[in-house]
């Protein structure tokens, strides 16, 4: 409800001349912000806003009064127009009055064209900040996205665009909307090279946003590499570097098993800082291709984000799939061949057929070297052949009978070694040769 004092002041405005009315409105705005009772702020400022736009004051006078209204609203924040310094009462006033001002501006084409800078300020410093303080991050992002850029009346720098888009991206990511965030990240990629060198903090935010989007999109290998690069940056505190290193390890663990992941794991494992992190135990086992127990996996899962525990199209979680594939690689280091059912038991799967399906997919994708005998239900791991990570590179080019031929070769080599030893003994001790044996 409008206070009686403001109502009386507004009633006197028609008595003022057209030239003196801007000053009259400015006096009313000052009266409102000076009042010790904030309960009428929103209603009083909205009443003044309505009265200002009902008058035909002209663009110049209206612009000046809009600036006064914006300053009056910003003065309500204890530490400036940032989400951290805005209480719930202030954010509500900013939203109510800010939207009212903006609606009046947009309803008048002349003002909408002429007050572009003021529109941007309302969106950026009032409405978006208020939404952020109320944890309405998607609303904040949409508000920021409405700010006009590069109109004929307003030119902005690449630095301004980059700061704005980073803020939009971070708001969308707060609500786990990676799809919308990626739209603005792609825009940012086109200009980041123009501002990155002179703005290391902005460049860091760009890299972190890219890593978070890759993480949310389950591009875990790329996310791990991005997080690790950030963890080496001297621009952030040691605690933050360790946190991003931890995120790099988590993403590497969740990445599809295979040569590319092995290279990333090696890099993380050899980083001396990793040993101080809680995730080092599982990192070490994965790097050394050791089998992971269910209890270890469950403990690791407690530190993952919700999207990292999401269910995939086949009903399993990303973590469960990653662990099965890792343990399959570990089994390939222990056995040269194994039956479908036995492998399924090792991997904790319901059936051997599921084990065959996973193995076949990894071989086809070049993440595991081996071959499958579907008739005898046996999987042969090729210990001397490393998959490259390229599709099809894991398929062995030799027939399944390789192991039998390998055994034959070993027996033949043993026989040849035995014969050579016998010949050497006979040369050294000819008396051991029985009488009548040829050559004696």
UniProtKB/Swiss-Prot annotation:
Gene3D superfamilies: Winged helix-like DNA-binding domain superfamily/Winged helix DNA-binding domain
Compartments where located: Cytoplasm; Nucleus
Keywords: Cytoplasm, Nucleus, Signalosome
Family matches, as InterPro entries: PCI_dom, PSMD12-CSN4-like_N, PSMD12/CSN4, WH-like_DNA-bd_sf, WH_DNA-bd_sf
Record carries keyword Cytoplasm: yes
Annotated PCI domain residues: 216-386
Any one cellular-component term (Gene Ontology): COP9 signalosome
Keyword Cell division annotated: no
Pfam families linked: PCI, PSMD12-CSN4_N
Family: Belongs to the CSN4 family.
Function per UniProt: Component of the COP9 signalosome (CSN) complex that acts as an regulator of the ubiquitin (Ubl) conjugation pathway by mediating the deneddylation of the cullin subunit of SCF-type E3 ubiquitin-protein ligase complexes. The CSN complex is involved in the regulation of the circadian clock through its control of the stability of the SCF(FWD1) complex.
Assembly and binders: Component of the COP9 signalosome (CSN) complex.
Identification of the protein by name: COP9 signalosome complex subunit 4
């Amino acid at each position: 409800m409008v206070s009686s004092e403001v109502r009386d002041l507004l009633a006197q405005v028609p008595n003022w001349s057209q030239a003196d009315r801007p000053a009259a409105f400015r006096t009313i705005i000052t009266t409102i912000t000076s009042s010790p009772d904030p309960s009428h702020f929103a209603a009083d400022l909205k009443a003044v806003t309505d009265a200002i736009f009902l008058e035909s004051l002209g663009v110049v006078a209206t612009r000046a009064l809009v600036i006064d209204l914006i300053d009056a609203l910003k003065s309500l924040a204890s530490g400036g127009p940032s989400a951290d310094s805005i209480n719930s009462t202030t954010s509500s006033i900013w939203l109510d009055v800010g939207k009212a001002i903006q609606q009046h501006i947009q309803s008048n084409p002349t003002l909408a064209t002429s007050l572009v800078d003021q529109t941007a300020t309302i969106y950026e410093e009032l409405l978006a900040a208020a939404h952020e303080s109320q944890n309405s991050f998607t609303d904040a992002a949409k508000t920021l996205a409405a700010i006009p850029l590069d109109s004929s009346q307003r030119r902005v720098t690449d630095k301004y665009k980059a700061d704005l888009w980073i803020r939009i991206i971070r708001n969308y990511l707060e609500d786990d909307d990676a799809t919308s965030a990626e739209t603005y990240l792609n825009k940012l990629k086109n200009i980041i090279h123009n501002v990155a060198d002179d703005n290391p903090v902005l460049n860091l935010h760009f890299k972190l946003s890219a890593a978070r989007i890759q993480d949310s999109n389950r591009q875990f290998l790329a996310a791990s590499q991005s997080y690790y690069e950030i963890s080496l940056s001297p621009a952030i505190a040691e605690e933050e570097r360790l946190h991003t290193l931890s995120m790099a390890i988590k993403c590497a663990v969740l990445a599809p098993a295979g040569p590319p992941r092995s290279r990333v794991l090696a890099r993380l494992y050899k980083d001396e800082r990793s040993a101080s992190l809680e995730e080092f135990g599982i990192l070490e086992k994965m790097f050394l291709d050791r089998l992971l127990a269910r209890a270890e996996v469950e403990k690791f899962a407690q530190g993952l984000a919700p999207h990292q525990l999401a269910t995939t199209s086949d009903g399993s979680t990303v973590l469960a799939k990653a662990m099965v594939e890792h343990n399959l690689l570990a089994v390939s280091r222990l056995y040269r061949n194994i039956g479908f059912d036995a492998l399924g038991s090792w991997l904790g799967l319901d059936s051997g057929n599921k084990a065959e399906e996973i193995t076949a997919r990894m071989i086809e994708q070049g993440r595991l070297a081996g071959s499958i005998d579907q008739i005898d239900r046996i999987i042969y791991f090729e210990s001397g052949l490393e998959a490259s990570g390229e599709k099809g590179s894991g398929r062995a080019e030799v027939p399944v009978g390789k192991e039998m031929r390998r055994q034959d070769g070993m027996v033949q080599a043993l026989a040849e070694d035995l014969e050579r030893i016998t010949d050497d003994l006979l040369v050294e001790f000819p008396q051991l040769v029985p009488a009548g044996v040829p050559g004696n």
